[in-house]
Amino acid sequence: MDDETLILLAYIRNAPTREKVLKSFKDEDFLRPIQVSKKTGIHPNNVSKKLKDLREHELVYVINPEYAIPRLYRLTEKGKNMLQFL
């Protein structure tokens, strides 16, 4: 595992909700924030914050940025790679 991956993994694991949100994409092509909330039990407002955070770290991306609701999220290749370590 390279240094960048190790640092990112530590960052993800530092916040249990961040890790739960990322793990919710396992076996899913895409998810809406409300689906992530239902799968994880995390309040929708917190899910939105964590998705924004994961997006800033290039782990997820918005499939349909032109629409505010419902936003559809998908893992990036980097996000898929990180899932194998969680």
Locations of regions flagged by a protein language model:
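Short, Lys/Arg-rich nucleic-acid/phosphate-binding segment
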Residues: 15, 64-72
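Conserved segment of winged-helix/HTH DNA-binding domains
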Residues: 27, 74-86
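Short alpha-helical segments that sit at the start of domains
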Residues: 1-20
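Pre-recognition alpha-helix immediately N-terminal to the DNA-recognition helix
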Residues: 19-23, 81
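Short acidic, hydrophobic short linear motifs in intrinsically disordered regions
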Residues: 30-38
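A short, conserved structural fragment
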Residues: 55-65
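Short amphipathic alpha-helical interaction segments
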Residues: 42-56
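Residues within the helices of the helix-turn-helix
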Residues: 23, 33-34, 52
